[in-house]
Amino acid sequence: MTEPKIQPLDINNLDADAAAILQPMIDAGRPWNIFLTLAKHPDLAKRWLVFSNHVLFKSTLPPRERELAILRIGWLCKSEYEWAQHKIIGSDAGLEAEEIEKIKDGPQGEWNQLDSLVLKATDELHAEKQISEETWTSLLEFWTEQQLMDLVFAVGQYTLVSMALKTFGVPLDDFLTCLLYTSP
């Protein structure tokens, strides 16, 4: 990776605004570089964290399927950081290592119907910026309208995050280097 355009903050040298934003992450262990970078813009970070928290922890999506979508959009956006970080989160959400690798191939292959639809919807959102009528109708057989809204916002959120991570050059955290994004 090239030198970051925006260097993450030094955890040992935080101003009051950054410390306030990062305190929950500090309490839970060392904050990841994404948070140390975004804390350089405290107003943005405060507001983004509310939305991010909804998408990752409070949405109506089942965690496993949420991670299918996040990993797929991370892969499609070629976001090394997103892919590495969510391989861990996806595994914690119940995805097997083989499934995580299969996400690279998209909705084709040996997925159950719901998994295939989640991946297909993610691909459609990436390519067309909307879910097709056919995919939407099929997903409604499994999920509520609120869940489909959360799916759209999850894919949008992680598209945005992938863009920021790549543009800012956020470096991989030390513990993520073994989980690098490798394209075919």
Residue ranges of each PLM-predicted region?
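Acidic/histidine-rich alpha-helical segments that form the ligand environment
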Residues: 105, 113-152
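Secretory/endomembrane lumenal or extracellular ectodomains immediately following the signal peptide
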Residues: 1-63
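Conserved alpha-helical segments that form or flank metal/cofactor-binding pockets of metalloenzymes
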Residues: 61, 65-68, 73-93, 97
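Preference for long, well-ordered alpha-helical segments
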Residues: 145-172, 177
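Short alpha-helical scaffolding segments that buttress acidic/His motifs in well-ordered protein cores
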Residues: 35-38, 48-55, 68-74, 103-104, ...
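Histidine/lysine/aspartate-rich catalytic loop segments that bind and position anionic ligands
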Residues: 91-101, 106-107, 111
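Conserved small/polar residues in nucleotide/adenosyl-binding loops
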Residues: 181-184
